[in-house]
C-alpha cells in the first residue's frame, strides 16, 4: 500500500504539470501581442520611412574601356565595358540633430525622428594616370550619398563648392539603389589641394540612424531629445551623455580600425551596405513590457510550486486537509496574474499594471483561502506572503544583471525556512496511512505539530 505522502506528492506534481498548459498559452499570447506591436512599427515605417543607414559621401568616376575580342567567326569585335572607380574621403565630419517624436497607432507606439545632418568632407587628389589610355573614355564623376530609404529625404542643400552644385535623385550605381548624387568635373578632382565640400541633408526615419565611416578619418556627432538611446553596434561612441532631456554622442574611427578602404580598393567593387561597419544609434522604449512580461512568465512555475509547497507544509504541520481542487483554483489565480499584467501593461505601463495585478490576485487568493483554511488570519498571511513574493519578482525583473544573485538568495531563504519549520517533524508518521483513519478518544485532542513548539 502506497503511503499518503506518496500520493499527495504525486498529485501535486500532476497539478503542476497541468498548470504548464496555461503557462504555455500565456507565452503564445505574449508573442502574439508583441507581433502586433512590430506590425505597427512596420506600418509607421511604410507611411514615413524606415531605419536609415547613410553611406557616403564618396566620389564615383565612371569610365568605359574598349576591348577587342574575337567572335565565333574569328572576326574582331570591339566591346565596351562600363567600370566604376571609387574615391573615399580623407576626412569626414557629420553633425546631426535628429528630433524624436512618438507616433501612436491604437494602443501601440513607435519613435520617428527628423533632423539635419551637416556634412563636411575632404577628398585628396586622385591618381588617374592608369586611365589615360587610348582605349579608355572617362565619364563625368559625381559625388554619391546612398541611403536605406530615400523617402526620408526632406531637403538637401546644394553641394558647397566655389560654384554650388545641386544634388540629383538616384545613385548612378546599380548596386546602390537609393540615394542622391551631385555631378562634378575632372578639373575639380585634379586640384592640388583636393576637393573640400559641405552640405546639409534633412533626414527622417524610424528606430535607428547609422553612418558608415568611409573617411580615412571619420567623426559623427549626434544630439537628440530622446533620453533612451542604444549605442550597440560596430563602434561604441568615444563620448556620450544621456539625461532626461536627451542624449549626445561622438564617434571617431579611422581606416586602421575599420579597414573600410579595402572594400573599395578595386574598381567595380560590389558594395554591400549592410555588411560595412557603421556608427549606430537606436531609439528604444524605456520599458519593453512584453519582454518583462515574458521574463515574468518564466518564473510562473516557480511561484506555483512555492505556493503549493506552502499549502503542503500547512497541511502537514496543522493536520488541516486541502483538496486538490483548491490547489488547482489557487494555481489558476496565480496564472491569471500574468494575463492581467500583460493586458493592463498595454494601457497603464508595466509598473502600475504589476501593482494592480499583484494586489488583485493576492486579494482574491487571500479571500478564498480564509474560507478554505478556516481562518481569516491564515488567508491574510498567505496573501501577504504572495505580495512579498511578487515584490521580490519585481526586483528580479527590474535588475536583470543581479537577477541570478537575487534568485539564488530567495531560493536559499525559502529552503532555510522549510528546513526550520520541519526540523522536528516525523515524516514517517506523516506518511503513515493509519494517521488519517485512527480515532481520537473523546475529549482528547489529536496530537499535532505546533509551529510555536
Identify the function of each model-found stretch.
Residues 20, 41-43, 53, 279-285:
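Cytosol/matrix-facing amphipathic helices and coiled-coil assembly/linker segments
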Residues 301-453:
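Generic detector of multi-pass transmembrane helix bundles and their immediately adjacent loops
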Residues 26-50:
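Alpha-helical transmembrane signal-anchor/signal-peptide segments
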Residues 275-304, 323-324:
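Cytosolic-side membrane-insertion boundary helix
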Residues 2-28:
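Hydrophobic alpha-helical transmembrane signal-anchor segments
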Residues 35, 39, 46, 60, ...:
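Soluble non-transmembrane domains of integral membrane proteins
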Residues 45-70:
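Short extracytoplasmic
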Residues 23-27, 286-296, 395, 399:
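Glycine- and acidic
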Amino acid at each position: 500500500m502506497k503511503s499518503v505522502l506518496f500520493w499527495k506528492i504525486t498529485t501535486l506534481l500532476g497539478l503542476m504539470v497541468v498548470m504548464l498548459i496555461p503557462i504555455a498559452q500565456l507565452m503564445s499570447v505574449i508573442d502574439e501581442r508583441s507581433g502586433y506591436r512590430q506590425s505597427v512599427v512596420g506600418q509607421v515605417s511604410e507611411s514615413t520611412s524606415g531605419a536609415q543607414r547613410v553611406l557616403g559621401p564618396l566620389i564615383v568616376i565612371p569610365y568605359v574601356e574598349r576591348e577587342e575580342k574575337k567572335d565565333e567567326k574569328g572576326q574582331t569585335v570591339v566591346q565596351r565595358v562600363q567600370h566604376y572607380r571609387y574615391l573615399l574621403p580623407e576626412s569626414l565630419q557629420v553633425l546631426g540633430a535628429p528630433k524624436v517624436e512618438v507616433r501612436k497607432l491604437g494602443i501601440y507606439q513607435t519613435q520617428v525622428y527628423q533632423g539635419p545632418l551637416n556634412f563636411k568632407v575632404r577628398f585628396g587628389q586622385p591618381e588617374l594616370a592608369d586611365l589615360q589610355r587610348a582605349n579608355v573614355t572617362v565619364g563625368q564623376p559625381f559625388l554619391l550619398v546612398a541611403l536605406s530609404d530615400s523617402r526620408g529625404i526632406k531637403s538637401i542643400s546644394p553641394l558647397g563648392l566655389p560654384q554650388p552644385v545641386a544634388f540629383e535623385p538616384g545613385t548612378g550605381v546599380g548596386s546602390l539603389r537609393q540615394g542622391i548624387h551631385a555631378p562634378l568635373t575632372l578639373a575639380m578632382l585634379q586640384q592640388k589641394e583636393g576637393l573640400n565640400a559641405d552640405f546639409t541633408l534633412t533626414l527622417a526615419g524610424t528606430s535607428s540612424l547609422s553612418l558608415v565611416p568611409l573617411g580615412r578619418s571619420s567623426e559623427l556627432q549626434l544630439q537628440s531629445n530622446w533620453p533612451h538611446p542604444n549605442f550597440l553596434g560596430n563602434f561604441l561612441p568615444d563620448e556620450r551623455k544621456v539625461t532626461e532631456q536627451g542624449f549626445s554622442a561622438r564617434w571617431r574611427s579611422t581606416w586602421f580600425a575599420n579597414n573600410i578602404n579595402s572594400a573599395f580598393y578595386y574598381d567595380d567593387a560590389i558594395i554591400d551596405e549592410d555588411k560595412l561597419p557603421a556608427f549606430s544609434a537606436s531609439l528604444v522604449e524605456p520599458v519593453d513590457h512584453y519582454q518583462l512580461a515574458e521574463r515574468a512568465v518564466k518564473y510562473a512555475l516557480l511561484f506555483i510550486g512555492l505556493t503549493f509547497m506552502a499549502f503542503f507544509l500547512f497541511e502537514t504541520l496543522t493536520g488541516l486537509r486541502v483538496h486538490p481542487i483548491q490547489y488547482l483554483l489557487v494555481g489558476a489565480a496565480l496564472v491569471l496574474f500574468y494575463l492581467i499584467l500583460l493586458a493592463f501593461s498595454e494601457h497603464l505601463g508595466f509598473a502600475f499594471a504589476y501593482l494592480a495585478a499583484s494586489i488583485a490576485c493576492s486579494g482574491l487568493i487571500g479571500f478564498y483561502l480564509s474560507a478554505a483554511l478556516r481562518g481569516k488570519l491564515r488567508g491574510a498571511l498567505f496573501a501577504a506572503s504572495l505580495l512579498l513574493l511578487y515584490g521580490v519578482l519585481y526586483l528580479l525583473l527590474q535588475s536583470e544583471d543581479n537577477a541570478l544573485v537575487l534568485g539564488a538568495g530567495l531560493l536559499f531563504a525559502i529552503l532555510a525556512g522549510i528546513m526550520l519549520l520541519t526540523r522536528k517533524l516525523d515524516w514517517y508518521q506523516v506518511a503513515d496511512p493509519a494517521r488519517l483513519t485512527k480515532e481520537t478518544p473523546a475529549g482528547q485532542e489529536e496530537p499535532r505539530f505546533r509551529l510555536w513548539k
